[in-house]
């Protein structure tokens, strides 16, 4: 849906809370400028999330290298979406974040609802941003303001 966010909002005539818009304030509050985006391959590789962060918020989200993207995508679809939580998969996520923070990533975005099943904020030395929680909070805030 977020890939077509503006079109959806225009068609239905009500405000759509873009997931990147609900995540950006927390990224900025943490002082991050180049967080690592972990998500499905589509979300990491296409520009609807990264581009939105860059164009609307000045945040340059990074993504892992191609092999790591493929493994993260596989873990999400073949394990997490099936309710399978494996220690070696958690270690893969942690290692990807370690590699990318060594290259300059200053935070980590959980860009898929299932990632929070595998890793938690306390697993990382950099700030993390669980988009599921942040998006839900933005929707609640909007509902309470209306």
Language-model region placement:
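Non-catalytic structural scaffold of enzyme domains
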Residues: 1-146
């Amino acid at each position: 849906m977020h890939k077509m966010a503006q079109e959806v909002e225009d068609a239905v005539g009500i405000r759509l809370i873009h997931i990147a818009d609900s995540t950006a304030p927390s990224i900025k509050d943490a002082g991050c400028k180049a967080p690592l985006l972990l998500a499905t391959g589509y979300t990491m590789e296409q520009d609807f999330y990264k581009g939105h962060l860059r164009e609307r918020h000045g945040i340059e989200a990074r993504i892992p290298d191609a092999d790591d993207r493929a493994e993260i995508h596989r873990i999400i679809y073949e394990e997490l979406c099936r309710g399978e939580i494996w220690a070696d998969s958690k270690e893969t996520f942690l290692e990807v974040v370690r590699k990318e923070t060594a290259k300059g990533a200053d935070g980590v975005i959980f860009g898929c609802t299932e990632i929070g099943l595998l890793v938690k904020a306390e697993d990382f030395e950099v700030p993390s941003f669980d988009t599921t929680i942040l998006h839900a909070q933005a929707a609640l805030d909007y509902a309470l303001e209306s």
